[in-house]
């Protein structure tokens, strides 16, 4: 789907899949609507679309994350998690503000914004395109130390609907290696398609690693 609404996780059965973590109060799941139909998948002016994506990023980083932290007396930082294009958003948020998060799980994300803008890129979209801003990050940038203090997962399958995710995840793996950034980059098999069936399995598989359990 091109628009991921906040009830998608519950509708897909993710709350049931993660019940033991939720019921045991090991995690709290907070989901957020996207506006991808106005940004990544719109036919409108490209600069306006890029501005909409930046506004979404700022909303989550500056309003949603503080709200999430206010819900609990836990001192732990939240984990940025997303599936499909939600994985793209989760990665952008984490890579731009690793100080806000304890870790990242990006499933079936795509990391080259230019693909969705006909090869076009401006300064605003650059900030939302990990395959553009990460290669230019200086080796001494303080975020690299923060990245390496966190647990990051980038996972994609090699089945239907995942060509762009597979392509950009492979490129991202190379960039992370070149920058000396540690991450778990995992490619599942050719039978692993785009969709909740596999994302739920991947969440169960990777969540203990990111939570340190």
PLM segments and residue spans:
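Non-catalytic cap/lid and distal C-terminal segments of serine-dependent acyl enzymes
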Residues: 1-213
């Amino acid at each position: 789907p091109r628009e991921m609404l906040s009830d998608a996780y519950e509708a897909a059965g993710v709350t049931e899949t993660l019940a033991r973590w939720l019921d045991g109060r090991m995690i709290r799941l907070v989901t957020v609507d996207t506006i991808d139909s106005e940004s990544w998948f719109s036919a409108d002016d490209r600069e306006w679309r890029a501005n909409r994506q930046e506004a979404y990023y700022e909303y989550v980083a500056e309003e949603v994350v503080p709200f999430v932290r206010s819900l609990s007396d836990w001192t732990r930082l939240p984990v940025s998690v997303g599936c499909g294009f939600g994985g793209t958003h989760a990665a952008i948020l984490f890579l731009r503000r690793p100080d806000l998060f304890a870790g990242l799980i990006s499933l079936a994300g795509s990391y080259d914004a230019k693909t969705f803008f006909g090869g076009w890129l401006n300064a605003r979209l650059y900030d939302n395109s990990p395959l553009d801003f990460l290669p230019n990050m200086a080796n001494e940038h303080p975020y690299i130390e923060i990245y390496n203090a966190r647990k990051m997962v980038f996972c994609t399958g090699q089945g239907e609907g995942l060509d762009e995710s597979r392509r950009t995840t492979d490129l991202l793996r190379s960039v992370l290696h070149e920058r000396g950034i540690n991450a778990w980059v995992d490619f599942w098999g050719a039978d692993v398609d785009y969709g909740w069936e596999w994302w739920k399995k991947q969440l169960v598989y990777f969540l203990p690693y990111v939570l340190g359990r």
